[in-house]
């Protein structure tokens, strides 16, 4: 069984990687990925684009000499390594909480590693390959998982405690830089897990907590001393808060919470639409109650594995094998279908094993003692923490609270494993992991195939056959012929009109920072989005007025989402169109959007 599981897991990882591979050197989106590149290549750390994530992506981008294909590749490798580390942390729990005290063999651990690494590739389902704030948030959540799990079992050495606590603190810091709400939530959740779930003595838990706090404070101190000073950091988050609450959609924090709760309330119906009633199959473990007690563990393991396999087959048969265009948005609901199946199995197993002991459970008034004394309930706590991490990763996303969790599919898969282990104990880990490896691997591969076939606001990889220079640093990417013509015409028209690298550009299109990045334009110190003249004026008010008086304009005439320049350029002491002349009109092939480049007239 181990050999079969490993062979299947390796095959699915290779297949998923093959579906992702073209994305590294093919295609680029001037909207989202344009923003990611501008933020990672900003002139200084004081440039803020809804958070400080670009500051911490810049060293990675610089490491590969601003080569976009290599930057994407190293991002995928780092995410896979973080997923592998999270799987190793889960393996520590398997060993520490096993009934025999020995835990799984190397084959089972290797299978868990492959499951996590393959599931992490689901982050790229939309084929947005360039590292971003989402990438940092997921990386942080995986590092938190890798650091937290070993701290839930008795310590093997002080050195290991230091390492695990340090990784946990680093994960919270990285997650915070990706999404501040995620970083805060990860830190608070980890503290609760240490206090309530860890099997360590109070002294050891206190020591681990102090190490986490100390390392976290050291990271914050290093940031304030070496990266960005206190006043600039506060200003950066002030601007981030402005965009989070007063931006183009006018969302307040309360609005985001309300939207998230609304999507959660609709989750059961969406899961039912994706998987039918198959997730209820996990409750069939209750049938094991009719068997002799010595046969129940084997029956529970078999029923749990079979239920997960059937749910996976139902979902993938409906949505996955063809790599359908909508499959990426289906993936989080598929993850929750598996999660509900494992939850039903775990609750059923607990009903069989724990109901006779109910009086003992009720007599306990210390939740921490209860969680620490019963391995099955500890697995429930671990699964809950992983699901909450996925939710924190997705909170505040424009893609929707639940749909955004497609990127955190790896956390939902690990939570499913934890709940399945609550049902089967670690003795059933191998069987469960073989099924999860196949089900999750097929889902991720299908998601990536869907992304590869579609392309994200650009030509699909198989149509991207012409090399184009998409960066003022000379980085090249293979794009569709019409996209290559756009970049070529943009460069020639701008150069002929006298544009030089470092010239400011006021981007009043719906959202196309990649165009300015290709030209080498000086970006604003604060993100300017289309849709809202007040936000654009607010951003311009923070620029050097003398320098930006000579800024060029990038417009999208005819777009209902662009900004009317007559309502904005007064912030730099000009009027439109009297003070400008059009020098280029180009069509971006995606959605055939027309872009116009306007040069300021000499005084």
What residue spans do the PLM features occupy?
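Extracytoplasmic catalytic/substrate-binding loops of multi-pass membrane glycan-assembly enzymes
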Residues: 17-37, 45-60, 65-69, 230, ...
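Aromatic/acidic, Gly/Pro-rich catalytic loop(s) in extracytoplasmic/lumenal soluble domains
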Residues: 551-603
């Amino acid at each position: 069984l181990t050999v079969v599981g490993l062979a299947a897991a390796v095959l699915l990882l290779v297949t998923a990687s093959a579906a992702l591979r073209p994305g590294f050197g093919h295609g680029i989106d001037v909207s989202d990925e344009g923003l990611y590149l501008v933020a990672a290549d900003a002139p200084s750390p004081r440039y803020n684009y809804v958070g400080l994530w670009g500051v911490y992506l810049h060293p990675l981008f610089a490491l590969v000499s601003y080569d976009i294909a290599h930057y994407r590749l190293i991002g995928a490798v780092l995410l896979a390594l973080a997923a592998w580390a999270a799987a190793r942390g889960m393996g520590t729990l398997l060993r520490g909480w096993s009934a025999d005290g020995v835990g799984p063999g190397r084959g089972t651990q290797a299978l868990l590693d492959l499951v996590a690494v393959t599931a992490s590739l689901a982050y790229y389902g939309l084929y947005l390959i360039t590292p971003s704030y989402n990438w940092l948030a997921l990386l942080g959540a995986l590092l938190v998982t890798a650091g937290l799990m070993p701290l839930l079992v008795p310590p093997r050495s002080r050195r290991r405690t230091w390492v695990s606590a340090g990784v946990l603190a680093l994960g919270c810091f990285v997650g915070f830089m990706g999404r501040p709400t995620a970083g805060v939530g990860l830190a608070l959740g980890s503290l609760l897990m240490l206090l309530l779930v860890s099997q360590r003595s109070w002294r050891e838990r206190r020591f681990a907590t102090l190490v986490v706090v100390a390392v976290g404070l050291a990271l914050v101190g290093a940031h304030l001393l070496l990266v960005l000073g206190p006043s600039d950091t506060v200003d950066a988050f002030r601007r981030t808060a402005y965009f989070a609450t007063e931006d183009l959609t006018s969302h307040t924090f309360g609005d985001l919470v309300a939207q998230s709760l609304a999507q959660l309330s609709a989750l059961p119906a969406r899961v039912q639409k994706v998987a039918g009633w198959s997730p209820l199959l996990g409750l069939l473990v209750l049938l094991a109650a009719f068997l002799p007690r010595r046969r129940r563990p084997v029956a529970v393991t078999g029923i749990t594995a079979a239920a997960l396999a059937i749910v996976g087959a139902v979902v993938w048969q409906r949505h996955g094998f063809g790599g359908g265009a909508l499959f990426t948005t289906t993936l989080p609901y598929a993850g929750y279908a598996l999660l509900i199946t494992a939850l039903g199995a775990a609750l059923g197993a607990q009903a069989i094993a724990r109901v006779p002991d109910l009086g003992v459970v009720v007599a306990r008034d210390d939740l921490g003692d209860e969680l620490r004394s019963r391995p099955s309930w500890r697995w429930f706590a671990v699964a809950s923490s992983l699901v909450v991490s996925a939710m924190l990763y997705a909170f505040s996303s424009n893609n929707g609270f639940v749909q955004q969790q497609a990127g955190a599919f790896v956390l939902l898969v690990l939570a499913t494993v934890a709940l399945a282990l609550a049902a089967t104990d670690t003795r059933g880990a191998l069987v469960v992991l073989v099924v999860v490896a196949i089900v999750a691997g097929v889902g991720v591969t299908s998601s990536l195939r869907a992304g590869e076939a579609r392309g994200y606001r650009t030509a699909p990889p198989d149509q991207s056959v012409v090399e184009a220079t998409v960066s003022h640093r000379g980085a090249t990417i293979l794009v569709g012929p019409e996209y290559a013509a756009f970049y070529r015409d943009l460069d020639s028209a701008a150069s002929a009109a006298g544009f030089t690298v470092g010239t400011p550009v006021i981007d009043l299109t719906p959202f196309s920072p990649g165009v300015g990045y290709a030209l080498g334009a000086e970006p604003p110190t604060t993100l300017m989005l289309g849709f809202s003249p007040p936000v654009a004026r607010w951003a311009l008010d923070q620029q050097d007025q003398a320098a930006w008086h000579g800024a060029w304009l990038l417009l999208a005439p005819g777009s209902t989402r662009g900004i009317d320049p007559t309502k904005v350029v007064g912030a730099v002491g000009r009027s439109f169109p009297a003070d400008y002349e059009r020098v280029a009109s180009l069509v971006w092939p995606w959605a055939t959007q027309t872009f116009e480049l306007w040069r300021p007239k000499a005084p």
